[in-house]
Amino acid sequence: MKRKKLVIGSILMGMTLSLSACGSSDNIVTTKSGSISESDFNKKLKENYGKQNLSEMVVEKVLHDKYKVTDEEVTKQLEELKDKMGDNFNTYMESNGVKNEDQLKEKLKLTFAFEKAIKATVTEKDIKDHYKPKLQVSHILVKDEKTAKEIKEKLNSGEDFAALAKQYSEDPGSKEKGGELSEFGPGMMVKEFEDAAYKLEVGQLSEPVKSSFGYHIIKLTDKKELKPYEEEKENIRKELEQQRIQDPQFHQQVTRDLLKNADIKVSDKDLKDTFKELEK
């Protein structure tokens, strides 16, 4: 079982600050320099954390309403977590900011609900768009286009790809392996690299491809056999779900979409513009 992340992006932090300005004048701290009342304390909390905490509470409310998580699911996950962590279970809870199993169950429940929200975004079109064979490639990565073109000329004149990769490549993970990368499928590489790789035939070299890492020269060494769509459909769905679950930017988009569709109305004047960003 993979270790569940208990924090899904900054907007779902497990903060439990009380924001109720109850108007009490009871002091919660006294010093030689003066005292701090409960109402002053709550006012300060509201000023500093009110909007963030309100956002989190609304997201939790929407998630639990739209994506039901059963007690059985949570209990099963908790027991698996206990088995995995063993004697380190209590340390694990402390490191994740929870004091007891009930709090942990609530966090697991929220995590499950958010994962269900993410999984629901995978459509039939997404699956069909990713129905492509997995590729095996080697590449040479350099910082500038001039060097990339010079290396391509050497390759065109018959020089060995692996030898040039060991000499020039600035990718530490593949350099000593002659530029060889692990097998990959759709959505696993930066777009520019992936698009170029899927256009190649086995044995073919790409022109220099610019990405955020630099300039790549790609060699397609193998294209795996593609199984029938119906056999691969569920595997592709699961891969897409896991990619999105692990993508913080996708978390933000899902959260934004949940809030935009929640018909939120804020009556508190101090928190009125909490969801103003959703209007853009």
Curated annotation (Swiss-Prot):
Ranges where the PpiC domain occurs: 132-222
Places the protein is found: Cell membrane
Residue numbers with lipid attached (S-diacylglycerol cysteine): C22
EC number in record: 5.2.1.8
Gene3D superfamilies: 3.10.50.40
Summary of the function given for this chain in its UniProt record: Plays a major role in protein secretion by helping the post-translocational extracellular folding of several secreted proteins.
Stated name of the protein: Foldase protein PrsA 4
Organism expressing this protein natively: Bacillus cereus (strain ATCC 14579 / DSM 31 / CCUG 7414 / JCM 2152 / NBRC 15305 / NCIMB 9373 / NCTC 2599 / NRRL B-3711)
